[in-house]
Amino acid sequence: MEKIHDQNIFFLKELFEDQYFDWIYYKQPITFNFFRSGGGTHLYLIENANRKYVARINYYEPKNAWGVKKQEYDVLKFIEPLKISPKAYYFSNNNSIKQDLTIVEYIEGEILGDISDKHIFDLATDLNKLHKTYQFDRTGDTLPPQDSSPYRCTIYNEFANGEDKKIEKYLSWEDINKIIEPYNRINKKLGDWFNNLRIFDNLTKFCLCHADLKKENILTTDKGIMLIDWECAGSDIPETDIGRLFSGCEFSERQQDIFLKAYYGNIPDEIILQRIIFIKKVLDFFYILEDYIILKRKTWNPDKMLKELLGYEKQMDGRA
């Protein structure tokens, strides 16, 4: 891995020598250092004249084909006037390292930890601003969006079909066998239920959504909340963003109520609430896998994971 980082830093140094960027002060030193990795992206901190930038370079090969760095760059340019995200400075999908990359503003801040009421109000304000400012008559992950009608909420399929969400991928994990059957059983039951809901029928108004709202992508700063990692952004119904937020940040019912009143001005119609809660329900299931295996937020313990899965199934059977 160290060899890859050396290669990427060498590439960045050459890039800044070969090209002139008007946002760089070339009379001052430019330093490049590995920052961290995650989500198929290596991050490198670039420092120059008291300013900082982040180079975001793919390392998971399929991300190049998906075009997520181009989408992120386009979206960040598009929403720059809102001042809720980093500025985008550079994009490349044709280079010597054969990996798509962006260079964006480095935001001084901390990943969202304990969630205060002010954080919730700030999130509601930022998302309301995003959703109301950029509205579309189609969905899709390009700008402008190009998906055909009628609308279908594909959030279950998006997660269930992900390579990293297949439990068989983790057969080498100790005692994984006790997880496989219940995970697949609940997964199928969840898909059969969610994909036959009628509450998503006949929707024709959509908006720009972040589409990956979780604590890791939310920074608290001196100027308020900032949203980072916009690779998944696209046009969808706002309920998808809110459901992702509630699940990804593990909002309590009280915190959900505070957000809904701040975002909508009051508690919204029942059908809107159902869309949000049912989307959250889908994500809650897949986040169990993320917690124990993919992102390792929790220490691997198959018995505890099984207990969470069975508890989830019991709740789902009572609600579905």
Named regions from a protein language model:
Residues 33-150, 154:
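ATP-binding pocket architecture of kinase catalytic cores
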Residues 59-60, 101-114, 132, 161-170, ...:
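A glycine-centered beta->alpha junction motif in the catalytic cores
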Residues 25-34:
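Conserved N-terminal boundary motif of the eukaryotic protein kinase catalytic domain
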Residues 8-26, 132-211, 311-319:
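An alpha-helical support segment within catalytic cores of ATP-dependent transferases
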Residues 4, 61-67, 297-303:
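Short, flexible/disordered intra-domain loops and linkers
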Residues 36-47, 54-55, 188-240:
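Active-site acidic catalytic loop and adjacent metal/ATP-binding pocket
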Residues 60, 109, 225, 233-235, ...:
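Activation segment
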Residues 239-268, 281-300, 307-315:
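Active-site activation/catalytic loop segments of kinase-like enzymes and analogous catalytic loops
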